C-alpha cells in the first residue's frame, strides 16, 4: 500500500479517536446561555460592552444587560443577574443620578438602559434605581415632540421620529406605567407606535 495513503489513514484515525474521546460540552446548555457567557467573557465588566473605553450609559449596553436579566429569569443562574447589577451600580451614583447621561440632550437612547432597573428595583428595593427610573420618566414627559405629538429622537434631531426610538421608549413607558400605576402611559406608547406606523409603513416600497 502507498506510504502516503497509510500516513493519511493514520492521521484520520488519530483525529477521529481524539474527537470521540474529547470532553463534550453539555448538550443541555442552550445557545442563549453560550452566547451570554461568551459576551461576559469578552466583556468582563459590562461597561466594556461595544468595546467602550470607559463607563457610559448606552443603549447597546442596555440591550445586552436586559438580555442577561432575561437569561437569569429563564435559567435561575444568578451570574447573569449580578452582571446586570454591576452595570447599573457602576453608572448610578449614591443619589440615584445616572453618570454620563446628559439630560438636556433629550436623547431617547438614554431610556433603553432604564429597562434593566425594574428588575433590580424589584429585587433590592434600592431607591437609587427608582430615582433613576423617575429621571427617565421625567425626560420622556418633557421630550420635544413633532406637531402631531411624536417624540423627537434627540434634541439635535429636530422633528425626527426614529423606529428604534419606539423600541427604546415605548416598552419603558408601558412598564413604568404598569409598575407605578400610571396607565396613561399605555395610551402614550400606543399613540407613538401608531403615529410612526402611519408615517413609515408603505407597501409600495416593497420590491420583489
Residue ranges and their predicted role:
Residues 77-118:
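Mid-chain, structured segments of secreted extracytoplasmic proteins
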Residues 206-208:
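Conserved small/polar residues in nucleotide/adenosyl-binding loops
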Residues 111-168:
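Extracytoplasmic mature domains of secreted/periplasmic and thylakoid-lumen proteins
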Residues 57-73, 105-122, 162-178:
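Well-ordered alpha-helical segments within folded domains of soluble proteins
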Residues 1-27:
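Bacterial Sec-dependent N-terminal signal peptides
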Residues 121-125, 173-198:
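Basic phosphate/pyrophosphate-binding loop/patch that engages nucleotide-derived ligands
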Residues 23-92, 127-135, 139, 143, ...:
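Low-complexity, Ser/Thr/Pro/Gly-enriched N-terminal "stalk/linker" regions
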Amino acid at each position: 500500500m502507498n506510504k502516503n495513503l497509510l500516513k493519511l489513514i493514520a492521521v484520520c484515525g488519530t483525529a477521529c479517536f481524539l474527537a470521540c474521546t474529547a470532553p463534550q460540552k453539555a448538550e443541555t446548555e442552550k445557545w442563549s446561555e453560550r452566547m451570554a457567557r461568551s459576551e461576559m467573557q469578552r466583556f468582563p465588566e459590562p461597561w466594556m460592552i461595544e468595546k467602550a473605553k470607559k463607563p457610559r450609559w448606552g443603549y447597546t449596553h442596555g440591550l445586552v444587560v436586559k438580555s442577561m436579566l432575561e437569561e437569569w429569569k429563564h435559567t435561575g443562574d444568578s451570574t447573569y443577574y449580578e452582571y446586570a447589577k454591576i452595570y447599573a451600580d457602576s453608572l448610578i451614583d449614591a443619589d440615584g443620578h445616572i453618570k454620563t447621561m446628559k439630560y438636556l440632550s433629550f436623547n431617547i437612547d438614554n431610556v433603553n438602559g432604564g429597562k434593566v432597573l425594574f428588575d433590580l428595583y424589584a429585587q433590592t428595593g434600592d431607591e437609587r434605581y427608582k430615582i433613576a427610573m423617575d429621571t427617565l420618566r421625567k425626560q420622556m414627559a418633557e421630550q420635544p415632540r413633532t406637531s402631531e405629538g411624536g417624540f423627537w429622537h434627540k434634541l439635535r434631531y429636530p422633528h425626527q421620529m426614529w423606529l428604534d426610538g419606539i423600541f427604546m421608549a415605548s416598552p419603558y413607558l408601558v412598564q413604568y406605567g404598569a409598575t407605578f400605576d400610571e396607565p396613561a402611559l399605555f395610551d402614550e406608547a400606543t399613540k407613538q407606535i401608531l403615529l410612526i406606523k402611519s408615517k413609515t409603513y408603505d407597501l409600495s416600497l416593497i420590491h420583489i
